[in-house]
């Protein structure tokens, strides 16, 4: 899949899809996934780094 900008609910949804039952770390007040995926586009591989 092409890299895409994912913010807010879209980002959480994508994490659910990628991580499934493993769950994930989502701390919106921390730098990291929002910088990586919202402010600039990220890939599914990037998202997988945030799975538990």
From Swiss-Prot:
Q: What is its main location?
A: secreted
SUPFAM superfamilies attached to this UniProt entry? Insulin-like (SSF56994)
State whether keyword Secreted applies.
yes
One Gene Ontology term from the biological process aspect of the record:
glucose metabolic process
Q: Could you tell me which cysteines form disulfide bridges?
A: 7-38, 19-51, 37-42
**Is Chaperone set as a keyword in this record?**
no
Q: The organism sits in which domain of life?
A: Eukaryota
Per the record, what is one GO cellular component?
A: extracellular space
- InterPro entries found in the cross-reference section: Insulin, Insulin-like, Insulin-like_sf, Insulin_CS, Insulin_family
PROSITE patterns associated with the record: INSULIN
Q: Which UniProt keyword terms apply here?
A: Carbohydrate metabolism, Disulfide bond, Glucose metabolism, Hormone, Secreted
Q: Which GO terms describe its molecular function?
A: hormone activity
Q: Which family does it belong to?
A: Belongs to the insulin family.
| Subunit and partners | Heterodimer of a B chain and an A chain linked by two disulfide bonds.
* Primary role: Insulin decreases blood glucose concentration. It increases cell permeability to monosaccharides, amino acids and fatty acids. It accelerates glycolysis, the pentose phosphate cycle, and glycogen synthesis in liver.
Protein name, per record? Insulin-2
Organism equals Huso dauricus (Kaluga sturgeon)
Provide the organism lineage as a comma list. Eukaryota, Metazoa, Chordata, Craniata, Vertebrata
